[in-house]
């Protein structure tokens, strides 16, 4: 399939990160419960992966459920977990023809999940481990501070065990102990709903990432919106801290 002419010749990001904000406000505007918005958000995620694959984007990291999201009502948390479980159990029918090309990696803390959820996570990761056209990181019970603390503990353990000299700790060593160690840092972060903050997401990895904010609620974010973000990204000059 030929790319849209607006992005046919642009500098395409290798890795995009997404904070899909606005599901609840989208539902409220329609007189619906939050669960309705989260369900629509799953469909928007499916379309995101489909479009990212079409455009040649290699990595998509999606902030599905943060460590702070446990503070929401019990009914809403259950609805989100049920949607997540349904997605990873039935991803082959939900993602469509692209299923043979997408590798799923679920990152975050799994300690609070039921055995059924953990088993389903392991299943989808195992079934898709050889797919390499698009790597889809799904962040669930994820927090950037927790990720950094966990990486620090692993490095400290290696130093204590004599596997690593403290003077050999570098940016790369630290990055290799993060959940996203197999991926380059995101080139572009997209956040929907008009909010302009990173909310404890990929705190280390976003050091030199370009940010794109849109007023669209996540369920309304589609192909045209992704194209707009990519076009704007391509017009920026990335300096990585230099002049």
For the regions a language model picked out, list residue spans one by one.
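Flexible, compositionally biased loop and terminal segments
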Residues: 1-243
């Amino acid at each position: 399939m030929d790319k849209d002419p607006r992005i046919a010749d642009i500098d395409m990001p290798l890795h995009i990160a997404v904070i899909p904000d606005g599901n609840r406000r989208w539902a409220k505007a329609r007189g619906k419960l939050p669960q309705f918005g989260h369900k629509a958000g799953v469909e928007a995620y499916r379309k995101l992966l489909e479009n990212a694959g079409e455009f040649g984007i290699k990595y998509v990291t999606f902030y599905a459920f943060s460590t702070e999201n446990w503070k929401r009502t019990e009914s809403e948390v259950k609805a989100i977990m049920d949607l997540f479980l349904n997605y990873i159990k039935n991803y082959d029918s939900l993602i469509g023809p692209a299923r043979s090309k997408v590798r799923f990696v679920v990152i975050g803390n799994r300690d609070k999940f039921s055995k059924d959820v953990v088993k389903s996570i392991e299943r989808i990761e195992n079934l898709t481990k050889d797919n390499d056209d698009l790597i889809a990181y799904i962040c669930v019970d994820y927090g950037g501070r927790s990720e950094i603390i966990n990486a620090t503990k692993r490095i400290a353990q290696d130093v204590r065990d004599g596997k690593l000299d403290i003077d050999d700790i570098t940016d790369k060593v630290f990055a290799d102990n993060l959940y996203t160690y197999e991926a380059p840092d995101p080139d572009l972060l997209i956040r929907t709903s008009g909010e302009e903050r990173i909310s404890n997401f990929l705190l280390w990895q976003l050091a030199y990432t370009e940010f794109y904010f849109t007023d669209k609620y996540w369920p309304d974010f589609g192909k045209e919106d992704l194209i707009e973000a990519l076009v704007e990204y391509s017009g920026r000059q990335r300096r990585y801290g230099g002049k």
